[in-house]
């Protein structure tokens, strides 16, 4: 993703938008509420995680919660995590894991077929008016990430 995106910041924003779409599609496919599932974007090794900042941009934070600059020199291998959001679980994780390819395809279709130009709460989450003025498209960034997810065979994805 880093090579296809002009910056880590844009890659991070793309992952956050993709996670938003995947979260909503997963809840629909699992016939659950979005609050039944949690979502997170972070490093697969647990060195950092991402949140949506008050400025609308993704922010990287280390495990203690301190903000990291997007050009942080550590490994940059973002991942999307969808999980059962109830303490002890209510049985959503295992069937959700088995539907990962369907979730990715559904999220890609959702974002591709949305009528918005830059992104909206129906596809990648709220988009700042300033993004629209600058032509910055969180929707396009999310489509890039989802396209990368969809292009790799599920058999290549990490196993639990």
Q: For the regions a protein language model found, what residue spans apply to each?
A:
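Extended, highly charged accessory segments
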Residues: 3-160
């Amino acid at each position: 993703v880093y090579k296809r995106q002009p910056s880590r910041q844009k890659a991070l924003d793309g992952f956050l938008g993709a996670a938003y779409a995947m979260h909503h599609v997963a809840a629909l496919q699992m016939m659950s509420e979005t609050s039944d599932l949690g979502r997170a974007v972070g490093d697969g090794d647990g060195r950092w995680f991402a949140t949506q900042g008050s400025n609308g941009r993704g922010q990287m934070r280390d495990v203690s919660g301190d903000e990291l600059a997007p050009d942080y020199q550590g490994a940059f291998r973002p991942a999307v995590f969808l999980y059962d959001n109830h303490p002890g679980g209510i049985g959503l994780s295992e069937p959700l894991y088995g539907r990962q390819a369907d979730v990715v395809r559904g999220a890609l279709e959702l974002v591709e077929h949305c009528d918005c130009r830059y992104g909206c709460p129906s596809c990648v989450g709220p988009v700042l008016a300033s993004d629209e003025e600058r032509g910055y498209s969180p929707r396009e960034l999310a489509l890039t990430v989802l396209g990368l997810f969809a292009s790799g065979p599920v058999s290549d994805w990490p196993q639990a």
